[in-house]
């Protein structure tokens, strides 16, 4: 592939160890979750499933929550319909917008307004100035 960086195949993901994922920048806990999910799931089937089915399968896996499912939906499955719910910057944004500590459900509601573009909206909103302000409601 002439030096191009291509996504790993399902087989390559299943064969990778958590330590290899840590070397790529994942936190150890997320690396363990990814390695376990890669071994438990039929990744090719996941790619071919409707996004709602794929997300439901992901969320049934141990240690996979809405943030991880959003990352997989966006970058692994190429779907823009599911945002990165619960992301720290989105939590800060919601906290500053609402004037109270935000919940994961608040980030879900924020992204729901963007419909089929919630995934792209989540990436954009992570860079909103209020997402980086730490002087928010306690």
Feature names for model-found ranges:
Residues 1-138:
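HhH-family (HhH-GPD) DNA N-glycosylase catalytic core used in base-excision repair
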């Amino acid at each position: 592939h002439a030096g191009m960086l291509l996504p790993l195949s399902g087989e390559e993901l299943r064969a990778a160890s958590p330590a290899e994922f840590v070397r790529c920048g994942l936190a150890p806990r997320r690396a363990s979750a990814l390695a376990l999910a890669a071994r438990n799931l039929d990744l090719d089937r996941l790619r071919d499933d409707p996004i709602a089915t794929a997300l439901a399968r992901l969320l049934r896996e141990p240690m996979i929550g809405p943030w991880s499912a959003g990352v997989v939906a966006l970058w692994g499955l190429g779907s823009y319909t599911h945002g990165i719910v619960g992301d720290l910057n989105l939590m800060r944004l919601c906290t500053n917008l609402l004037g109270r500590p935000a919940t994961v459900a608040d980030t879900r509601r924020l992204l729901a307004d963007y419909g089929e573009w919630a995934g792209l909206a989540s990436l954009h909103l992570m860079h909103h100035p209020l997402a980086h302000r730490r002087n928010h409601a306690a």
